[in-house]
């Protein structure tokens, strides 16, 4: 009989190919900062230490009886890795206001991999992936439009085409790094859909990163809030619309995004649904107490 971890990893590979049979969805809430409560340390310290990150995330996953854990959440780490200053005294970090970034430069994969938070996340992934009995390992990253907004907020000046190309190359490089480390699921999270004149550049960035993910048999999932998702869903990524998003014909919705606040989570569907994956649209608030989180996870599972 196929072990649960192996079963879910195979299902994620099928999702990347648009294949496979319907099944009860994999529940992957974006949990990161909450895990620091296990050691009673600041989250910003935990996310810079691969071993601590692995231990705390794995322990919290076991406490919550989840079949997946998330080793990275959207938290400005992509911008930080290319030279943007971010706050180091709070979680999640915030973008600084000045940066010298050349968007025409080649992406240095070694530099990205050496950025402290990315290095710790990759280290944690490798440690977890060594055990074939472990569950699905996910990485949730900043979407290209959100990354462009962060770069511009930091003072990076560039035209739309150049800066979206830069964002796409960053995310493609990270997709390769995470996939090679052992991640089974990649998601890109947007706060807003870009303006119409930027749409083609945005789709190009999604395609650049998504193609790399699919090459490694990892599904590239796009999470976009319902209130900001005007226009057809881009074909470059697996659609993961918000819970109240209208249907996406002719696209089949194999993933769904719930709100980050556990108090608003509905009950998990069991069988007979198209969704094979349920994420949260952002990180679960890090101040959420583990006992509260556990009670909410048990509630949505009907326990």
Swiss-Prot record:
Divalent metal cations. Magnesium or manganese are required for activity. Catalyzes the carboxylation of acetophenone to form 3-oxo-3-phenylpropanoate (benzoylacetate) in the anaerobic catabolism of ethylbenzene. Also carboxylates propiophenone at the same rate and 4-acetyl-pyridine at lower rates. It comes from Aromatoleum aromaticum (strain DSM 19018 / LMG 30748 / EbN1) (Azoarcus sp. (strain EbN1)). Acetophenone carboxylase consists of five subunits; a heterooctameric subcomplex of two alpha (Apc1), two beta (Apc2), two gamma (Apc3) and two delta (Apc4) subunits assembles with the epsilon (Apc5) subunit in an unknown stoichiometry. The epsilon subunit dissociates during enzyme purification. However, Apc5 is required for acetophenone carboxylation and the enzyme complex is reconstituted using recombinant Apc5. Induction: By ethylbenzene, toluene and acetophenone. It catalyses: acetophenone + hydrogencarbonate + 2 ATP + H2O = 3-oxo-3-phenylpropanoate + 2 ADP + 2 phosphate + 2 H(+). It is found in: Cytoplasm. Inhibited by zinc ions, carbamoylphosphate and beta,gamma-imido-ATP. GO terms for molecular function: ATP binding; ligase activity. The lineage of its organism: Bacteria, Pseudomonadati, Pseudomonadota, Betaproteobacteria, Rhodocyclales. One of its GO terms (cellular component) is cytoplasm. The gene is apc5. Its cofactor is Mg(2+); Mn(2+). Keywords: ATP-binding, Cytoplasm, Ligase, Nucleotide-binding. This is Acetophenone carboxylase epsilon subunit. Its EC number is 6.4.1.8. Its main location: cytoplasm.
């Amino acid at each position: 009989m196929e072990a649960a971890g192996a079963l879910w990893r195979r299902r994620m590979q099928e999702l990347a190919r648009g294949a496979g049979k319907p099944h009860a969805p994999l529940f992957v809430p974006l949990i990161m900062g909450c895990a620091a409560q296990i050691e009673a340390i600041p989250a910003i310290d935990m996310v810079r230490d691969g071993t601590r990150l692995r231990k705390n995330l794995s322990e919290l996953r076991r406490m919550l009886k989840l079949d997946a854990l998330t080793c990275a959440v959207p938290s400005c780490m992509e911008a930080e890795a290319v030279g943007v200053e971010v706050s180091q005294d709070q979680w999640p970090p915030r973008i600084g206001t000045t940066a010298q970034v050349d968007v025409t430069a080649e992406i240095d994969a070694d530099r990205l991999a050496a950025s402290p938070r990315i290095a710790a996340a990759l280290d944690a992934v490798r440690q977890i992936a060594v055990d074939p009995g472990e569950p699905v390992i996910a990485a949730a990253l900043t979407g290209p439009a959100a990354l462009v907004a962060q770069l511009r907020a930091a003072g990076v000046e560039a035209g739309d085409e150049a800066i979206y190309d830069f964002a796409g190359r960053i995310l493609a490089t990270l997709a390769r790094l995470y996939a090679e480390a052992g991640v089974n699921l990649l998601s890109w999270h947007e706060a807003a859909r870009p303006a119409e004149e930027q749409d083609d550049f945005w789709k190009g960035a999604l395609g650049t990163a998504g193609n790399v993910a699919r090459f490694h048999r990892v599904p590239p999932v796009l999470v976009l809030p319902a209130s900001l998702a005007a226009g057809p869903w881009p074909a470059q990524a697996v659609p993961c619309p918000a819970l109240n998003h209208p249907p996406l014909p002719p696209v089949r919705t194999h993933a769904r995004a719930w709100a980050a606040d556990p108090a608003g989570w509905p009950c998990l569907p069991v069988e007979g649904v198209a969704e094979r994956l349920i994420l949260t649209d952002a990180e679960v608030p890090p101040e959420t107490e583990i006992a509260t989180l556990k009670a909410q996870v048990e509630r949505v599972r009907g326990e």
